[in-house]
Amino acid sequence: MNDFYVGYVPKMPPGLRVFVRRVVAIIGLLAMAVAAALLLGQMPFAKSTFEFGQVRSFEGILETNPYPTLLVDRPGETESNPKYSRYLLVAPGKHGADTLFQNTNGKRVRLKGELIYRADQTMIEVEPASIRALESVEPNPAPFRSLGEVHVTGEIVDSKCYLGVMNPGMGKAHRDCASRCISGGIPPLFVTRTGDQFLLVDPDGRPFPGDALRKFVAEPISVQGELLERGDSKFLKIDLAQLY
């Protein structure tokens, strides 16, 4: 009965005190081990950025096909480097920018917006009221250059969230958001297992209809298609019947 503890007694019996201390220490160590395992199991945040609230001014040539893109003059042009930096354009929220740039293809425009970027891909979330089309009309943009057929495995994401608005901007947890963004006109992006990024277009080189890609978003898929290049942007021309 020496180790029987009564709550109002000032001190716990020695034997019981040692036992309780050991149990508490073991529980504490287990809790720290579980916390460390959960921390190590988390995916690291991607090095992507959305300059929310930092509005900048831009001027360049507008290219609307297949996705609205601003071509900004690049200093130090050489034979091995493209003449322009290419910035994808999107509207605020889960909306593409197609309706913002009707009848302005090939024109030089001024606009304001916030940068979104990841790796070598850059996007601008445009302030609709800031768009100003200038009088000068530039020559037609460079044609697509075929890089041949490729077979790739990866995931379809919405480019806006993936490039920086959300982190992470891919995976099952982001599926519903990505589906709504793509349905709203945000350019769909195919990200391979090695991190390559290709804008998706249909067999005719045009954007897919709103919900055409919904069931494939955030799923691990493989596809074969023609890889195209225009400037420093790459496009993957695919047939949905060949996705698996």
Question: Where do the language-model regions lie?
Answer:
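OB-fold and OB-like single-stranded nucleic-acid-recognition modules
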Residues: 1-244
